[in-house]
A protein has these predicted regions:
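Nucleotide 5′-phosphate-binding alpha/beta core
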Residues: 1-52
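Residue-level recognition of alpha-helix initiation/capping sites
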Residues: 4-5, 64, 135
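Gly/Ser/Thr-rich helix-start
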Residues: 16-19, 67, 134, 161
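Flexible, active-site-adjacent loop/turn segments at secondary-structure boundaries
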Residues: 21, 60-61, 134, 157
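AMP-binding/adenylate-forming
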Residues: 26-40, 52-112
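Short, flexible, solvent-exposed loop/turn segments with mixed acidic/basic and small polar residues
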Residues: 45-46, 71, 120
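Active-site glycine/GP-rich loop and adjacent strand/helix microenvironment
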Residues: 76-199
Length: 199
């Protein structure tokens, strides 16, 4: 109706394809996002069986991801907004201890730089990963798991954008299974995705 809601939030696009755009949502619209994020968190990470501490390595600002991610997950677990600060994340892990289950979130290039850091022995911590913002390959996920010293670490991609909101889609164990199969079988990959590249 052209009117701003009295309560809600305003996200801003990155401006990568032109001037940044403001996206205005009411609290009612945000409620759907909270429900989707809760499902994603508990379904993909079995969060009801773990004592997660989430370290948010997303960039913070007017964009849809950083601050909003923390606002959502603090309803379901303990969250610290470290932003994309490698030293802060390493310091936080050392301060909070090795007995916790950690979920570290961030963009793929940042996460690779983080886990390449020699400032901590990653293998001594129980870490799962949430990423998004750009695509990742099967090889990238293998590299991250190897860096963590845990071939069973969950490394999940979540999908969204400023205009449609964050976390509207996400990988599951089943979609990862299909992707792995296609990665190993080029014929199957083409039959499923009509391309020679693994998605």
């Amino acid at each position: 109706n052209g009117k701003f809601p009295k309560i809600g939030n305003i996200d801003e696009s990155s401006g990568s394809s032109g001037p940044p755009t403001n996206w205005i949502r009411s609290l009612k619209e945000e409620d759907l996002l909270f429900k989707a994020a809760k499902f994603e968190f508990f379904y993909t990470y079995n969060a009801d069986k773990k004592n997660y501490v989430v370290l948010s390595g997303w960039s913070s600002g007017p964009w849809a991801t950083g601050v909003k991610f923390c606002e959502i997950l603090e309803h379901y677990t303990l969250v610290k907004n470290t932003t994309a600060d490698i030293e802060n994340i390493i310091r936080s892990l050392k301060n909070l201890g090795k007995d916790k289950d950690y979920l570290i979130a961030g963009y793929p290039p940042f996460l690779k730089n983080l886990f390449d850091s020699k400032g901590i022995n990653w293998k001594e911590y129980k870490i799962d990963v949430l990423t998004g913002g750009e695509s990742t390959s099967v090889e990238w996920k293998k590299y991250i798991r190897k860096s963590l010293g845990n071939k069973n670490a969950k490394v999940i991609s979540s999908y969204g954008a400023s205009d449609i909101d964050i976390g509207i889609g996400f990988e599951t164990p089943f979609t990862e299974f299909i992707r792995e199969l296609a990665y190993k079988n080029s014929k199957l990959n083409y039959e499923l995705f009509k391309t020679g590249e693994n998605p």
